[in-house]
Amino acid sequence: MRVVILGSGVVGVTSAWYLAKEGHDVTVIDRQDGPAQETSAGNAGQISPGYAAPWAAPGVPLKAIKWMFQRHAPLAIRLDGSSLQLRWMWQMLRNCDTSHYMVNKSRMVRLAEYSRDCLKDLRAATGIQYEGRQGGTLQLFRTEQQFDNAAKDIAVLDDAGVPYSLLTAEQLATVEPALAKVAHKLTGGLRLPNDETGDCKLFTERLAKMAEQAGVKFIFNRSVDKLLVEGDQIAGVLCGDDIIKADAYVVAFGAYSTALLAGLVSIPVYPLKGYSLTIPITDPASAPFSTVLDETYKIAITRFDDRIRVGGMAEIVGFNTQLAPARRETLEMVVRDLYPHGGDISQAVFWSGLRPMTPDGTPIVGRTPLKNLYLNTGHGTLGWTMACGSGQLLADIIQGRRPAIVADDLSVARYRAGFQPLNIAPLHDIHPIR
């Protein structure tokens, strides 16, 4: 079967890989001159199923108000009055209660845990290298309240069967030696030993080459103008003067998926702007061993081979990708505070990207009302974490095979009034069926 995939970020490329492995004739189209040139290019580098959780959480509305007056706030909102922004924010607010949070988190952890297994299998099968580490992640607390509140996260981890360890400030250096010098600034941490790290851009570029060798065709520097519809299916993709036809079509367009699908399929995907710094390492012993997440500022600091990636924050500002100096100051402040001698900040590369976020935090993977149109989008800040699982899941669905995890509540159908999952996965049973 001929399959066209729109988008060559990590989600689009993993989709292409798994579909090609099923024997399909796959073509990937992207407006950029190569894979992973937008959102996948500069993310924080964490593969963190244990921290998979929606931004829509109890207490976030009040925190958002407080953050409006803080210089280094993790979330910023700039209202533009657009119906897309206002509708998305309203939908997000409706998901900020405990019951919605638990349902959404269970979906996200289910897919993220499965995705990590898929990545491990892919790595074993191909030997792909992407400066990956399997050193776990460490969430850092700066206040006693944060340390005490970890009990709530631990309860969720227990239900999900995710291994963890709660560390005192003095114990942090046992997993991140460079933190010994700043332990007095911290109250403790939550470590998830099974989480991983890696350069998402490098992974995507190398997997794209492997996919090309497996027969996938990549068409770069080509804008996608419109999806053409005949009856109840897609008839082709309009790219300038050309119409590209296939038997099935996959939209992996990230934050731009909503506009492309307008009038065809309604999806609540909105751009959540994030930032990162990439810093050359000058003293390996003073740099992170793996990755940490500063709970106060929601900023991750990750070790690659000879670089430190510092990423995080969220801005609800539409499709604005301009670099904000104040955000760079925040990133620099956090890395200087925790790893002051690890790298040369004066040589850092500053980046911003638009994460495709749904109001419930869960990506949209699966079928649509148009019988040959499929979606793989809306992964928010967890595209790297969920990419392999989403790609394999989509390949199973297109292949007509039962997926390895419960998947009906990951599709766009969940936004339909009266939707009820065919299979309810309780929080304590969200691991892959293997």
Swiss-Prot record:
<dbReference type="GO" id="GO:0005886">
    <property type="term" value="C:plasma membrane"/>
</dbReference>
<comment type="function">
    <text>Oxidative deamination of D-amino acids.</text>
</comment>
<keyword id="KW-0560">Oxidoreductase</keyword>
<dbReference type="Pfam" id="PF01266">
    <property type="entry name" value="DAO"/>
</dbReference>
<dbReference type="GO" id="GO:0055130">
    <property type="term" value="P:D-alanine catabolic process"/>
</dbReference>
<dbReference type="InterPro" id="IPR006076">
    <property type="entry name" value="FAD-dep_OxRdtase"/>
</dbReference>
<dbReference type="GO" id="GO:0008718">
    <property type="term" value="F:D-amino-acid dehydrogenase activity"/>
</dbReference>
<dbReference type="GO" id="GO:0005737">
    <property type="term" value="C:cytoplasm"/>
</dbReference>
<comment type="pathway">
    <text>Amino-acid degradation; D-alanine degradation; NH(3) and pyruvate from D-alanine: step 1/1.</text>
</comment>
<dbReference type="InterPro" id="IPR023080">
    <property type="entry name" value="DadA"/>
</dbReference>
<comment type="similarity">
    <text>Belongs to the DadA oxidoreductase family.</text>
</comment>
<keyword id="KW-0285">Flavoprotein</keyword>
<dbReference type="InterPro" id="IPR036188">
    <property type="entry name" value="FAD/NAD-bd_sf"/>
</dbReference>
<feature type="binding site">
    <location>
        <begin position="3"/>
        <end position="17"/>
    </location>
    <ligand>
        <name>FAD</name>
    </ligand>
</feature>
<protein>
    <recommendedName>
        <fullName>D-amino acid dehydrogenase</fullName>
        <ecNumber>1.4.99.-</ecNumber>
    </recommendedName>
</protein>
<keyword id="KW-0274">FAD</keyword>
